[in-house]
């Protein structure tokens, strides 16, 4: 009978992974590294997004301040006088204009971000006509002059203040004797126009065209492009008669017609023309997209886009816009401040990199004995570096991702790739700082490492060559900055060496201080030995045996100081130049002027205004 004996081997002990062990034994260190990387990644990712957002805000303010009259792309075309009268009349009606407007939108494509709600089409007069109605105001005895505008979308962009919206039948022609119209509330108030008023425009080989006002409208968005391309549509103005030595004034305003009433203008002396206004979508403009926008505007004004528009509408179409000039002015301003932004970015980035390197160096210094023991017991540099890399990566990568997410939430509406690259650079540096420092310090295997002594250390030749190279670069950057400034010409953005000048100066200053630091210690060490007591000699000995890596804190501090000082001096110079330019242009902090005599009590009223110290009254004849 056989007997079976079962032999069980003792269970082998499971060794905990390195990363988990390190995180459990030093949670405070891991938390500190995560916090440092998260904050640095947040700042690094927020910087390019903030630059983008400020650039977008500046561009939008530039476009808004330029006014719709300059930024709208306007296509114009005269009536087709060579066509038969029915076709010519039909080409000016609302349906034909809307069809052409749709064709223009298709022809221009998506090269320009357009605000379709504020875009419009219509017919308007070229020559404002003198009104003979005796009830119209005449400030200096001159009759008012009125334009006639038949623009699409009047009902959608206004609300009725009195009366009803004007209507037009579909059979209006150049011989139609009377049509309906409307005026804005400002026009009605200043020109004494009421519902039921009749205005007569001189005819050409026909009786005058009568326009009966059926409604008074109030603009829903007076500052929108719909009303601002031709401001006379909403607000009449007092205009000085050209060439009049007495500077007499007359009122100038506009009457609003329904689009289907446009053919009636062909029988008047107003010289009507068709137009299609494309308003840019200001909220969709981005500062980094200006070169592409300028190319699109140029193509629309006199390029392939204009050719497609002519094929879709009429060969007589022309395009005009000052949007390219507005974009060019903004681009010059952005180019001028680009080097200053680069200086700030280089300075801030250098400080952040130094702080991360300093954190890695401190961590390697605290674990010096541990890492020395690992190398002495057979640990390879590759294995040591890999373990440390995994240890820092498991903390730094999630922290950097958290900082990136926080930056995207804090600064919305900007490009993501640059923020991801900046946060990725922080994560990479946070992961590699400790492994690289440890590998560099423990290349050779040894149980004992020599104690650092600043007073006895002698810089190596490689360090001397590196320092001299940095010194040469710093001198070249400073000389270039002093001779030609931050940019080389009106279209330059400044080279990176010039932008690095404050950082290089800080690096050289830190290296010089580190070089000079041992000299007073050596000079004081020998006299201190003759002193009574142990405090003085021991203090000097302790200072002399300090770590030689003190260059990193010095570099961080000096870089921050030099960058801040450079930025402060630039801002101060810009403020002084702005004040000086304003003073030379205006002659004072503010100036009130008019072609006519100002009210006699205006000076006293201005003098009583808060913040006004003195008022000078002057007359120029």
Language-model segments: residues:
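N-terminal Sec/SRP start-transfer signal
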Residues: 1-44, 452-470, 514-563
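Membrane transport/envelope proteins' first extracytoplasmic loop
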Residues: 1-350, 486-499, 512, 582-590
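Alpha-helical transmembrane segments
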Residues: 346-353, 414-434, 494-511
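Cytoplasmic membrane-interface regions of multi-pass membrane proteins
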Residues: 367-374, 381, 436-456, 518, ...
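C-terminal membrane-exit region of the final transmembrane helix in multipass inner-membrane proteins
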Residues: 403-463, 472-487, 514-515
